Curated annotation (Swiss-Prot):
Involved in fertilization by controlling sperm migration into the oviduct. Promotes the binding of sperm to the oocyte zona pellucida. Residues 395-484 form the Disintegrin domain. This is A disintegrin and metallopeptidase domain 3. The gene is Adam3. Residues 187-384 form the Peptidase M12B domain. It comes from the Eukaryota. It comes from Mus musculus (Mouse). GO terms for biological process: binding of sperm to zona pellucida; fertilization; flagellated sperm motility; gene expression; positive regulation of gene expression; proteolysis; regulation of mRNA processing; single fertilization. Keywords: Cell membrane, Disulfide bond, EGF-like domain, Membrane, Signal, Transmembrane, Transmembrane helix. It is a single-pass membrane protein. GO terms for cellular component: cell surface; membrane raft; plasma membrane; protein-containing complex; sperm head.
Length: 822
């Protein structure tokens, strides 16, 4: 069973706190904006400073702009029929800031500056909320203290297959020498939020207000995750404004399973997007549930978070932050072994009921550095295609490679425009008669959308599939790869993260062509040492010997030349084993450890330093290859079949003409199974088409003219020679000479002619209305099965052999993406 975390709140022990825990001690303050000396208007917009007086003391708030909303962020309403309707929200995406009070270095400020200041000021051990006084003409704001200390509950329940081992692993991870020298790099966690009807009603039943509150919560979350250089990007908000789509009552794990099942079946939910359902309950028994370390596993990218009646906005932001931390693989803090700069750190179970600054502890930071170097969090590195660009107020952003309303195209900034003949990079408009100006499926020379079937993204691995243009849009089809733990390499290995995890291949990539995977004795000797050259992210169990450091055979007399790793050589049983240690912990993936998904036993693979059963990690899937793909394909990461050559999607039906593929690769379009497959050639240039057509048509016209002349001559010759042929028939048989043989079965209306001097053999089976002619000097053999209305002619001196048996059309795709016909 995968590790499932339930964040429980035993609110039966809660001291009654009334309707709201925000006990306001109201103050009136007038924030003063300080002009900066920055001349650049754009740069000045990204940094602002305000002075706010709290209890008579002035605090200087130094703020920088936050960018955590997707450029195409939107709010959607789902009605009773399940239809998703866009709501055109007036939420402004350019006025969210975070920073600190200059007078208190250990402080955090998260504000929206549109129409006044709204947000939180977390000053050491006290938190203030600030909002504009709507009726004030002098920019007055109300300031109030926020308290959560009325809440008293134990927030954590764990469901691990081996809780003792997990605890031990955590203690090892928080040792200061582990990852202390590594540097974090920018990462993005993309998330979609769904709000149930009770939560919507609690927030006022007004879409604009609910949207603003959710955005405000994610402003707080991003302030906390900025310490890890992590942006939690809010992609969209969906509101169940009329009726819930699942039953939200019951135990935490039951609700989570129902939500995960609904998400997997809902076409609008992308499998790779992590999605959270926000629920409201007056007195729940828990405040959240999610899967541990599954942020990049599309089968488990879901969670639920409950907003109790007595929890403030700040506390709910901490609940979500803890759940997201669990998604990333973090554990709750051991307060006796972790250093916390403030009074309470984010992954401390008691953080939900405390006020003031919230940061990640030394344990969480070191643990995240370790996790970030592992392949299970590779999806967080994808920051290029949808990297957030702050949009100017009132419009889209021209030059960010994103096609937004009202842009006609977007080829990037002028100096690096990718489609200079098609798109004007200054105003993002199409040039002249251009049909497109953005994306890999827009031809840069003709400015037209490429035809269906053109290769636009090559395969990188046998577990990564090629994508093609679909002939309708200028963008390439979404990147598809094999679902995790699908078989590869002739079923000797498994796919994981779009790569076939073969131990021999990892050894070759790590040490060179003379390295290969180890046996048990070699791996045991090295990995049980529990040093920097041999460990399993901690001490190895005997069952996980193959899941620690990559220990390889070295079959070469020279030492390994590398500047990236320290290499250890172990002589054992007449053979040399090598393992490595990454010298510089830079936040990149540490490939000296065995990759997740690598085989470690029969039906077992490595996962986070342990050897687990494949069926346990796979769980229940929407796509099972043996059933859905009929044994002639594997499942991709979108739960569709990737079919073998000779079998056609979506269900891998036998189709000899099919090159294989899936319904997601861009080439295949939805079709009726009764409709024959017709493929078109792509990629031929206009001049080449004319030239090829000329060379094809010219011989055809010559042959056609020659046929007409020869047919006339043939008829005359036939009349002259037919009587002679009959006269000599008996004489020829008596001489034992070779004669034309005609075998015909069930044929009607046949016109056959042979000419003296030729050797002809014909076989017709069920053919009707046939017309054949041979001319002198030719050796001809024809065989037709089930064909009707055929007309053939051979020319003198030719050797001809035809056989037609309803052979299907065949299509192949070369590397350059152009089709070839055979």
């Amino acid at each position: 069973m995968l590790p499932l975390f339930l964040v429980l709140s035993y609110l039966g022990q809660v001291i009654a706190a009334g309707k709201d825990v925000e006990t306001p001690l109201l103050q009136i303050t007038v924030p003063e904006k300080i002009d900066t000396n920055i001349q650049d208007a754009k740069e000045a917009e990204t940094q602002v400073t305000y002075v706010v007086r709290i209890e008579g003391k002035a605090y200087t708030l130094q703020l920088e702009k936050q960018s955590f909303l997707h450029p195409l962020f939107g709010t959607y309403l789902r009605d009773k029929l399940g239809t998703l309707q866009p709501y055109f929200s007036l939420v402004k995406t350019h006025c969210f800031y975070q920073g600190h009070a200059a007078e208190i270095p250990v402080s955090t400020v998260t504000l929206s500056t549109c129409s006044g200041l709204r947000g939180l000021l977390q000053l050491e051990n006290i938190t203030y909320g600030i909002e504009p006084l709507e009726s004030s003409a002098t920019f007055e704001h109300i300031l109030y203290e926020i308290k959560n200390n009325k809440i008293d509950y134990s927030p954590l329940k764990e469901n691990f297959a081996n809780s003792e081992q997990e605890s031990q692993s955590y203690r090892i991870l928080v040792k200061p020498e582990k990852g202390s020298n590594s540097t974090l790099t920018k990462r993005i966690l993309r998330i979609k939020i769904i709000m149930d009807k009770a939560m919507f009603d609690h927030m006022g039943s007004e879409v604009g207000v609910a949207t603003q509150k959710v955005v405000h919560i994610f402003g707080l979350i991003n302030t906390m995750f900025s310490q890890l250089k992590m942006t939690v990007m809010l992609n969209s908000l969906e509101i169940w404004s009329e009726q819930d789509k699942i039953e939200t009552n019951g135990d935490a794990d039951e609700v989570l399973q129902r939500f995960l099942l609904w998400k997997s079946k809902e076409i609008s939910q992308k499998a790779q997007d992590i999605t959270y359902l926000l629920l409201y309950k007056d007195h729940p028994d828990y405040v959240g549930a999610t899967y541990h370390g599954m942020a990049c596993n599309p089968n488990f990218t879901a969670g639920i978070a409950l907003h109790p009646k007595t929890l403030a906005v700040e506390g709910f932001a901490i609940v979500l932050s803890q759940l997201l931390g669990i998604n990333l693989g973090l554990a709750y803090d051991d307060v006796y072994n972790c250093f916390c700069p403030g009074s309470t750190c984010i992954m401390n179970p008691s953080a939900i009921r405390s006020q003031g600054i919230k940061v990640f502890s030394s344990c969480s930071v070191d643990e995240f550095k370790q996790l970030a170097s592992q392949p299970e969090l590779d999806c967080l590195r994808n920051t290029s295609e949808t990297e957030f660009v702050v949009q100017p107020q009132g419009g889209s952003y021209c030059g960010n490679h994103l096609l937004e309303v009202p842009e006609q195209c977007d080829c990037g900034p002028p100096e690096t425009c990718t489609h200079k003949k098609c798109c004007n990079p200054k105003d993002c408009t199409l040039i002249d008669a251009a049909q497109c100006g953005t994306g890999p499926c827009c031809d840069k020379r003709t400015c037209t959308i490429a035809e269906r079937g053109r290769l636009c993204r090559k395969s990188k691995d046998q577990c990564d599939f090629p994508e093609f243009c679909n002939g309708e849009t200028e963008g390439c089809a979404p990147d598809t790869k094999a679902a995790d733990l699908e078989p590869c390499n002739n079923e000797t290995a498994y796919c994981f993260g779009g790569v076939c995890r073969d131990p021999d291949r990892q050894c070759t990539d790590l040490f060179g062509k003379y390295a290969k995977g180890p046996n048990y004795v070699c791996a045991q000797e090295v990995n049980l040492q529990n040093d920097k050259f041999g460990n399993c992210h901690g001490r190895c169990n005997y069952s996980a010997i193959f899941c620690g450091k990559a220990v390889c055979y070295w079959n070469f007399a020279e030492v390994i030349q590398t500047e990236k790793y320290d290499v250890q050589y172990t002589y054992l049983g007449g053979q040399v084993c090598v393992s490595a240690h990454l010298r510089s912990q830079t936040g990149t993936r540490d490939d000296t450890y065995v990759h997740d998904g690598t085989v470690c036993g029969s039906g077992q693979v490595c996962f986070r330093g342990d050897c687990l059963r494949v069926h346990v990690l796979r769980g229940t899937r929407e796509c099972e290859a043996d059933d859905k793909c009929q044994g002639h394909g594997i499942c991709n990461n979108l739960n569709n079949c990737q079919c073998e050559s000779g079998f056609a999607p979506p269900e891998c039906d036998m189709t000899p003409s099919s090159p294989g593929g899936s319904m997601d690769d861009g080439f295949w379009l939805p079709f009726d199974k009764s409709t024959p497959l017709i493929f078109k050639r792509h990629g031929l240039k206009y001049k080449k088409v004319l030239l090829i057509s000329f060379y094809i048509l010219l011989p055809f016209l010559v042959v056609l003219a020659f046929m007409a002349v020869k047919r006339m001559i043939g008829k005359r010759l036939a009349k002259q020679n037919i009587s002679k042929a009959l006269e000599h028939k008996e004489e020829a048989f008596n001489r034992g000479s070779m004669n034309p043989g005609v075998v015909s079965g069930g044929n009607t209306d046949q016109n056959l002619m042979t000419v003296p001097g030729s050797f002809n053999s014909y076989a017709y089976h069920g053919n009707t209305d046939q017309n054949f002619m041979t001319v002198p000097g030719s050796f001809n053999s024809y065989s037709y099965h089930g064909n009707t209305d055929q007309n053939f002619m051979t020319v003198p001196g030719s050797f001809n052999s035809y056989s037609y048996q309803d052979v299907p059309y065949y299509r192949s795709i070369p590397e350059d993406g152009n089709d070839s016909q055979q």
